[in-house]
Curated annotation (Swiss-Prot):
Residues 1-10 have a biased composition (Polar residues). InterPro entries: SHIPPO-rpt. This is O(6)-methylguanine-induced apoptosis 2. The modification Phosphotyrosine is found at residue 78. STPGR repeats lie at residues 73-80, 115-123, 154-160, 194-213, 232-254, 273-284, 313-323. GO terms for cellular component: mitochondrion; nucleus. May positively contribute to the induction of apoptosis triggered by O(6)-methylguanine. It is found in: Cytoplasm; Nucleus. Belongs to the STPG1 family. Residues 12-23 have a biased composition (Basic and acidic residues). It holds the Pfam family SHIPPO-rpt. The keyword Transport does not apply.
Length: 341
C-alpha cells in the first residue's frame, strides 16, 4: 500500500517539475477548516513531497495522525460552571431522567395589555338611560296589594334573657365543628300525673349487677333449665340387674264361638326401655384408612383386591405347573421314532 502511494507521489512530482506553483496563496483542494488533515489520495494539482524514509517498498511508516498545532482550545482548556443537580424537584425532566414530561409551566404568566375594569370611566352620554338590573319586574315579585302576615316571633324587648344561659359553661376554648343544640339541663315534664317513686316495683333483674363474665353479643335465648314434664323414664324407674321379661302368647279360650270372625287378640305390651348395662358400646374407629395419592389427576381404578364373584376360579397358588423333562426316542423297524417308556 505504501509502495503504491510512494510510486504515485514520485510520478506526480516528475510531472509538476518546471511548472510555477499558482495556488500558493489559495486554499488547496482536499483541505477543509473543520478537519485540517492531509488527504490520503494525492491529486494532480498538488505537489506532494515524500521523504526518503517512506520511499522504501517494505516496512514503510506512513503518518496516520495530524500533528499540526493550531489555536483551537482543547476539551479541558476552558472552565464551564455547571449548575447543581436538582434532587427535590417534582419534575423528572429537571433531574435528567426524562421519563415523564415536566409539569412546570413553559410560559410565564400572561399579562393583559388591556386596562382593568376600574381603569377607565364611561361617559354619561354612552351609559344607558334605563338600567334593567335595577328595575322592578312583576315576573319575579310578589303581589303588592296582598296583606302580608307578620312574624309571630317576639321582638327583642318582649322577653328577658336568662343570665345563666348566657354565661360560659366551661373554660375550654375549643368548640366542636358540629355542636349539638339539644339542651343538657333538666326539662320538667309538661304532663303531670306520672307515678311517684314508691308507686311501682322495680324489676330486680334490671337492678342487679351482671356477672363479670365475657358474654357474646349474640347470646342464645334458649333456656338451659330442666323441663317440668319429661316423657322418658326417670333415674330410678328401671333396675339394670333385672332380666327383660319375655312376652308370652295369650291362650285362646277353648269355648266355641258362634262368630264368623276370630276373637280379637290383645295388644302386646311395650317392652321396657333398655338400661345403662343392657347394651355394650364398641369403640368404633371407622373404616381403615388407605393411603391414596393426592395428585391432581388421580386414577379411578381401584388398587385394592376385590373378592371375586366366581369362587370356582383357581387362585394364584392353587396349582403348580411342572416343566416336562427330556424324553428318549427309539428308532424301530418301520423307520419311525418311538418315545422310550
Amino acid at each position: 500500500m505504501s509502495q503504491k502511494f510512494a510510486n504515485t507521489g514520485s510520478f506526480i512530482e516528475r510531472e509538476d517539475l518546471g511548472k510555477p506553483n499558482k495556488g500558493v496563496d489559495r486554499v488547496q483542494k482536499g483541505f477543509t477548516a473543520a478537519y485540517p488533515t492531509q488527504s490520503s489520495i494525492p491529486y494532480r494539482h498538488r505537489r506532494s513531497v515524500i521523504p526518503e524514509s517512506e520511499k522504501r517498498g517494505f516496512n514503510s511508516q506512513a503518518r496516520r495522525f495530524y500533528s499540526k498545532k493550531d489555536d483551537i482550545p482543547g476539551p479541558g482548556f476552558y472552565n464551564v460552571i455547571h449548575q447543581s443537580l436538582v434532587f427535590n424537584s417534582v419534575s423528572l425532566s429537571k433531574r435528567g431522567t426524562c421519563t415523564f414530561p415536566s409539569t412546570c409551566a413553559r410560559l410565564g404568566p400572561i399579562i393583559s395589555k388591556y386596562p382593568a375594569a376600574n381603569a377607565y370611566t364611561i361617559r354619561s352620554e354612552l351609559a344607558s338611560k334605563k338600567d334593567f338590573s335595577n328595575s322592578c319586574s312583576s315576573m319575579f315579585q310578589l303581589p303588592t296589594f296582598i296583606k302580608v302576615v307578620k312574624s309571630e316571633t317576639p321582638a327583642p324587648n318582649h322577653y328577658n334573657a336568662s343570665i345563666s344561659i348566657c354565661k360560659q359553661r366551661n373554660n375550654v376554648c375549643a368548640r366542636a365543628g358540629f355542636l349539638s343544640k339539644t339542651p343538657r339541663g333538666f326539662v320538667p315534664s309538661s304532663e303531670p300525673g306520672g307515678p311517684a317513686p314508691g308507686h311501682y316495683d322495680v324489676n330486680e333483674s334490671l337492678v342487679r349487677e351482671s356477672p363479670k363474665v365475657l358474654v357474646s353479643c349474640f347470646k342464645s335465648k334458649t333456656g338451659r333449665g330442666l323441663k317440668p314434664t319429661s316423657t322418658g323414664p326417670g333415674p330410678g324407674y328401671y333396675n339394670p340387674n333385672d332380666q327383660t321379661k319375655i312376652l308370652r302368647k295369650s291362650h285362646l279360650p277353648k269355648t266355641t264361638l258362634l262368630n264368623f270372625s276370630a276373637q280379637p287378640l290383645p295388644l302386646p305390651e311395650k317392652p321396657p326401655l333398655p338400661g345403662p348395662g343392657q347394651y355394650e358400646i364398641v369403640n368404633y374407629q371407622g373404616p381403615p384408612k388407605h393411603f391414596i395419592s393426592t395428585a391432581s389427576f388421580v386414577s379411578n381404578t381401584s388398587r385394592w383386591p376385590v373378592k371375586s364373584s366366581k369362587p370356582t376360579l383357581p387362585g394364584p397358588a392353587s396349582y403348580k405347573p411342572e416343566i416336562p423333562g427330556k424324553q428318549s426316542f427309539l428308532y424301530n423297524e418301520d423307520n419311525k421314532w418311538i418315545p422310550a417308556v
